[in-house]
Amino acid sequence: MEGRGFSGLYKNSSEELFLKTVMESPIGMPVPTMEMLGFKTVSQSFRTDSEELFKRWLTNDQEGYNSSSMGLNSRLSKRISTEIANMSNQQHIGVASEGRNNDKSCLQNNFLANDVSSDFNFPIRDPVDRELQSSNLFLAKAWFITDQRMTRSRSSELRRRYTEMQNSQAPQGLDSMFMVPEHDTNTIKEELANFNGFDYLSMCELPSQKGTFMSPSNSSSSTFNTHQLVDVDKVSSCVSMLKGTLQRKKLECQVEKEAAEDGLNEIFCIREPLFQSAFNEEESWNQQKLVNVQGDFTDQVNDPGVMQTLEGTTNFVLDGFANQTNQIQGRTASGEPSQSESSAAAPVISSGLDACEGPSNSNQTLGDSSWKQVGESTQNKVRGVREQIMDNLKDDRKRKSLERYGSVTSAVSDGKMDNTKKRRVERSRKMAEAKERNLTPTIPSDMQAILKRCENLEKEVRSLKLNLSFMNRKDSEQTKQIEDLQKQNEDLADEKERLLEEIERILSETGKI
């Protein structure tokens, strides 16, 4: 099969001359890079996140995979085939003795050799015809893909194809990689696994850009390498691909929550004491971060009366802590002896006040009984303090919500202004009248009766004026209606005269006939 493949390559005289110059030159062709093979985005795909990977795949691979790059790749694979076939053993031996950089170039060289050797599995026709057919087919498929409108089903299909490209590639002819040392391949695996938190993808799972455009047919007349797809768990690969994005989203959500909590603390926010957050029976009280002050003191006490004294000292009153922003964690003593000490050791008593802004990082193991005692006693004390502070806040709010009548500050909302404005004006008027009555000197009874009569007369005059204005408005409307009726009457009179003239004319015409 390889003999027929090499004989087919020598049909073209230009290629024969090119191969002769390559074989006779002492330096030879340079090792082809991944960019020459069309895998430019493979080395960069691990450093970007999932959305950038997908967009770059759409722009560079789906649309930019044109005929010129495919023709160049196929020409390079054919022209370099004899050089790689003749010098593969020497290159493998040289690579095995060198460092990590040469190992990477050896991997690329082997990958190119596999690509070239797989071309010989099919009967080779004229190379020009093969290049023209491949370029035409790729142009047609690229035009068909770019011409379609980006709908929801189209987007899902592209993402499914992108996932398959990331997860599968046909490993053909990888037996030539056995010369690579085992520790060097493990080193390359570790380097690939460190890119942006992605899991390791072996050379078998590297994306094949040709395989994304062709269907896996088994016909011998196919012009492409029909790669066999390797099934990989799609769920795990998608999770590993989106791990970086999810971690960034989690960090952003955590930052937003902390900012919101800080904003609420500035107003006033009482929090429950931190006796939760990752307490397990099998593990110690982990994952708590002490930020500010830890005022605990630990003593060994033999007298049980000290327990009551310490509990009594924690029953303090927090009257001035209305603007308390830190989380208060009051812990009472744990009466259980330490497990690491002997049974005759005295119990360790720990009491105090921890001012924390986050969970403290103390590795403290609590039993079930001590946990219940600490939780109940501290919750009762903090609940009493909290109720007292909330009562103070309610009093402050009531004091602020008083309306302004004279000298009291007003805190009325805009919605109640319309309802309270009338009552306020009436109350201010009554207060002014009462003030005038208090300021005016004493008047005899007859004068007071006269003044009262005058006030009543003023009210009657005011009402009469209102009635007169109403009547005038009514009169104006009636006069307008009368004028309209008079105008209509004049129009009807004119119409009547015109009709009479018409009747007379008709009668005169009939009399003449």
Curated annotation (Swiss-Prot):
Any GO CC annotation of this UniProt entry: nucleus
Quaternary structure (record): Forms homodimers. Interacts with CCAMK.
Keywords: Coiled coil, Nodulation, Nucleus
Chain ranges for the short sequence motif Nuclear localization signal as given in the UniProt record: 397-400, 421-424
Entry similarity comment: Belongs to the CYCLOPS family.
Sequence ranges of Low complexity compositional bias: 333-347
Any coiled-coil regions, as ranges: 447-513
PANTHER family assigned: PROTEIN CYCLOPS
Function summary: Involved symbiotic signaling. Required for root infection by symbiotic rhizobia, infection thread (IT) formation, and nodule development. Required for proper induction of early nodulin gene expression. Probably not involved in nodule organogenesis. Involved in arbuscular mycorrhizal (AM) symbiosis. Required for fungal infection of the outer cortical cell layers, and for arbuscule development during the AM symbiosis. Acts downstream of CCAMK. Required for symbiosome formation (i.e. the release of the bacteria from the ITs) and subsequent symbiosome development.
Major subcellular location class: nucleus
Disulphide bond pairs: none
Compartments, record wording: Nucleus
Full protein name: Protein CYCLOPS
GO biological process: arbuscular mycorrhizal association; nodulation
Compositional bias ranges of the Polar residues kind: 359-380
Gene Ontology MF terms: protein homodimerization activity; sequence-specific DNA binding
Disruption of the gene: reported phenotype: No visible phenotype under normal growth conditions, but roots of mutant plants are impaired in the interaction with both rhizobia and the arbuscular mycorrhiza (AM) fungus Glomus intraradices. Stunted growth when grown in nitrogen-limiting conditions and in presence of Sinorhizobium meliloti.
Segments for region (Disordered): 329-380, 395-435
Keyword Coiled coil belongs to the record: yes
